[in-house]
Amino acid sequence: MDSLSESSTSSYHGKRPRSLSEESQSSSNMDDISQKSISLGDASEISKNLPSIAEQKQLIGELVNNQPELELGQVDNYILSYSWYERLCSYLAEDGPFPGPVDQEDIADLETGTLKPDLQEEIDFTIISRDVWDLLVRWYGLKGPEFPRETVNLGSESHPHLVVEVYPPIFSLTLLSTNAVDANESHKPKKISLSSKSTLEDLLEGVKYTLSLPSDQFRLWRVDTDQPLHRTIDPSSFIKINSKEIIDFLEKSKTLVELGMDSSCSLVAECMINETWPVDRALRLQFLIQQRNNQSSNEEQKQEKRVPGTCGLSNLGNTCYMNSALQCLTHTRELRDFFTSDEWKNQVNESNPLGMGGQVASIFASLIKSLYSPEHSSFAPRQFKATIGKFNHSFLGYGQQDSQEFLAFLLDGLHEDLNRIYQKPYTSKPDLYEVDEEKIKNTAEECWRLHKLRNDSLIVDLFQGMYRSTLVCPVCNTVSITFDPFMDLTLPLPVKQVWSHTVTFIPADTNLTPLAIEVVLESKAATIEDLVKYVAEKSGCSDYRKILVTETYKGRFYRFLTQLSKSLLMEISEEDEIYLYELERPYEDGSDDILVPVYHISDDSTNSANSYMSSRDFGHPFVLQLSDNEVTDASFISEKLKLKYQQFTTLKNLKNIDSLESLELGHEDEQVQKGPLDVDMDHSQTPLFEMRVFHDRFEKIPTGWNMSVSNLPLLTERDKKDLESTVDPLDAHSIEEEDDSEFKDVAPGSYPEPSKSNENTKLTAKENDRLLIQGDLLVCEWPEKSYQFVFSVAPSSPQMGRSLWLESKTILSDKKDDSEDSRTITLNDCLDEFEKTEQLGEEDPWYCPTCKEFRQASKQMEIWRCPEILIFHLKRFSSERRFRDKIDDLVEFPIDNLDMSMRTGSYKLSEKENPKLIYELYAVDNHYGGLGGGHYTAFAKNPDNGQFYCFDDSRVTPVCPEETVTSAAYLLFYRRKTS
């Protein structure tokens, strides 16, 4: 199974990569894995040693900027979970909660302690230096295994290609045994791991040691089978395995990469017994048995004779992207005939500096001959892959690749190896600045002639066409017409890529009801800023900068999305709760205002008055915006809180109620205070709710994840303490391990946050007057009676308030989200989309020769010249900024009689009656699954019998032509029909 990356794996020379996955196979070096984790008891020590966010940024930045170059053979690279890495980045950007310990469990096979297979760089993991790794583990602790990795050279000494070996090959070892008892052993095979740059001699020594072989008299078989092997196997079972080959011991000095053994595979060791190989003896015995049944065997062989061209390709480890493209290409009749007849040898160009010395053409010819040999049911293209990888390091390892990118590289390599031009002349492509049919035709012919002066091969004859591009200046209407060759035609799919979500908007005006706003944005790469502007327009908010975007979870803030232009909406999943709060005024960096998150809990009266461990969340949190003057007045803070609470209850005079006793007596009007609340009221009066304060010195706007409400100080007590006492953060805000289940189990991780309080930092005189400072969070604790009276679900008295927490007005979008509509898309629709006029973006303007300025010109594409073999690349994968997506919609395409005549510019302008451009389908390259984990297969029509077959790596089955039209179709191969 393959995962797909729209771009090729990056290659790094010398400098350490930010993340690199040149190797991507099923296991990791088990000798390098050490299980390290941190207990809850260790968390306190870690959090005390954690520097401030600014200090962390500085220290990590210095290490990254001064990191050394990659050194061959050094194990100084570490694989880091990308999901934890993103949480860290969000935390350091003050955009998310504390990330918890370095959590590797999502990328680790916890049963074996190894790295999970098929992981993708920059999606599943990133790679950091040892120094950065050590720093992160010291600061945050470690949860799960660590994965140190070695630097290897996948190039040559003269042209080094240093990479981090993410997946060193692991070899499963099976011993061939003639002992009936041993041969029936069902234990799993033993395994050894080596670097891909180890030699064959290193491998042989490892096999001998691991299997405890008594002597050097053994030989090694490489086996490709879908059936799992056990620790031992008997000779009769072994010879039934179709795909196996003996490893040549004469090449002991060659590396595993050079031998094509740099991916994990199964090896069978066979020891000589009495100077006889057990496999040879078993084969002779099998031959004698077949001789006895010669006649029936001949009949069976006649019936089972394989059709040439129906040979599968073994998956060498994430190579189905290559296998599917090869099956499509090798079923091109003209290409097959050219290479099987050895005609290619007369045209190979070994001196072309842009070519591969004829090596790609040679290995491709060998591959085609193997695939069309009736002897093979399946073939392992190891040497082919090794040759391709030598010229393009992206395909050297076993990482996930794009089938279209591989095909483009292979066709270009074959073209240059077969280029009939030995001395390429200098040419200059003409441009046309007027719309004149005759001049357009002449310019197109000249462009093709010049192209052929430098590029002339069978590949050009078969696969290359030409398209016309027309640009029009929006200011002066200057027209520019150019012609360029293509090998395949990339077609956009006419599918709307929309982002839709229903969010909750809390107005600043407490007399207004919260709004549930349906958001539909016509770009999956839209930003938080796009969302805020949309909500501001729909809600009537005068200034979108006054809106604070948050994600909530179970009554708490999970993160604050303050990076408006940088954060993508696609980072928000369908189930995420998004709340947008309108502030009184814009809140920007440098503002004297502070934002204080407010949580609400109701006390269970069945517990003692001094215990807050049984408190429970209710409602949803909100945010108070307080100015410099407002944070010094406890009565003002209380009044402001009550005013905000009034937005969520039908009790509209809540701001005038000052105590629990006033509610119990039911004389609300008599209890109205004419002035502000006296903080030093009679202690016999129980306040409507108590304000408790939590501080986090690391988060500008704290989320309070994993905080305990036990022992939180009252806001008024904080005032009396003069805010100068130093409080041990973990003593004051410790994690309760017994009863506070409502707060412990809802968080993403189970580790405490670091240093929640002032940590030995005394406040200045100005700060000394404040009751609240930056990094504070309020927890309003409502006694049960207050809670029931103000936020009753079913009020028993007219004087009681009914809860409005769950009530909101709905605003539907005027844009319909039809992204899930089942409208049929055809190939013609895609061609229409390709031909549509579009405006260039701000980032890629065109220089107008008349205006002498860069302009966002209009651009239209048109096929001008159709090739004999027409390959359509359906653009199912999109990439905008950090977001990548796949379109899985079905595109219906014709199996026969695709008419391209009226879509081809040269045909439309031709004066004579040329034969129509009619095409028939002969191959389809399919991709199933998404970007994070998919698989390639192919449908191909046999050139001899006209039967379509499905090629799923080594498995080959016949199919009906209609079965080739699926939503997985990625590359379509058409051949022009001739008279």
From Swiss-Prot:
Any Pfam family: UCH
Biased composition (Polar residues): 1-12
Region (Disordered): 1-36, 721-762
GO cellular component, one term: cytoplasm
Boundaries of every DUSP domain copy: 51-152
Protein's GO biological process: protein deubiquitination; proteolysis
TM region(s), chain numbering: none
Modified residues (Phosphoserine): 19, 37, 39
SMART domains xrefs: DUSP
One MF annotation (Gene Ontology) recorded for this entry: metal-dependent deubiquitinase activity
Annotated keywords: Hydrolase, Phosphoprotein, Protease, Thiol protease, Ubl conjugation pathway
Calcium listed as a keyword: no
Domain USP: start-end pairs: 311-977
Taxonomy, superkingdom: Eukaryota
Residue stretches of biased makeup (Basic and acidic residues): 721-735
Reaction(s) this enzyme catalyzes, per UniProt: Thiol-dependent hydrolysis of ester, thioester, amide, peptide and isopeptide bonds formed by the C-terminal Gly of ubiquitin (a 76-residue protein attached to proteins as an intracellular targeting signal)
E.C. numbers: 3.4.19.12
Active site: 320, 935
Sequence similarity: Belongs to the peptidase C19 family.
Name the UniProt record assigns to this protein: Probable ubiquitin carboxyl-terminal hydrolase 12
Organism, scientific name: Schizosaccharomyces pombe (strain 972 / ATCC 24843)
Taxonomic classification: Eukaryota, Fungi, Dikarya, Ascomycota, Taphrinomycotina
